[in-house]
């Protein structure tokens, strides 16, 4: 058994390394200057008429979204000017993407804070958890 231990240990390490890589790609729980909200808290903001910005890829947006969400793909469309056309810096705004494994909404929230937006909400759980909760989608 001891002769096979190094090979077994190496196999286990190699087998678990993809899991470590996935864990490292988790979105942050908070964004400085923004408020992290749960799907339940986001629903209250939705019901209050707050602007939701979907920063996912166009194909994700086309496949399903929160009703009325504005699509500003973070890779091509999210600029200070484009966001300013959708929401004023003093007004609340919610950013979302594809949940914990997606960095787009945390990056967008940080960008908005940097541009002077004072009421930024970060829906870390994103569209998947919103949909799973049975909240409105289109």
What are these regions (language model features)?
Residues 84-130:
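Catalytic cysteine-centered active loop of the rhodanese-like fold, especially the PTP/DSP P-loop
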Residues 47-83:
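N-terminal, post-signal-peptide region of Sec/Tat-exported proteins
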Residues 2-52, 58-60:
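Flexible, polar/low-complexity N-terminal or interdomain linker segments that lie immediately upstream
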Residues 58, 75, 98-100, 135:
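Solvent-exposed coil/turn segments that connect beta secondary-structure elements
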Residues 47, 51, 66, 88, ...:
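Sec-exported extracytoplasmic/periplasmic mature domains
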Residues 138:
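Active-site-adjacent betaalpha module
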């Amino acid at each position: 058994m001891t002769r096979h231990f190094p090979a077994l240990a190496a196999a286990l390490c190699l087998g678990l390394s993809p899991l470590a890589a996935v864990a490292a790609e988790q979105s942050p729980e908070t964004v400085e200057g923004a408020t992290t909200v749960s799907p339940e808290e986001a629903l209250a903001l939705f019901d209050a008429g707050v602007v939701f910005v979907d920063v996912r890829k166009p194909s994700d947006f086309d496949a399903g979204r929160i009703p009325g969400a504005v699509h500003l793909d973070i890779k091509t469309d999210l600029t200070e000017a484009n966001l300013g056309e959708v929401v004023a810096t003093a007004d609340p705004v919610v950013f979302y993407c594809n949940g914990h494994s997606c960095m787009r909404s945390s990056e967008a929230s940080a960008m908005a804070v940097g541009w002077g937006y004072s009421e930024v909400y970060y829906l870390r759980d994103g569209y998947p958890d919103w949909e799973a909760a049975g909240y409105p989608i289109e």
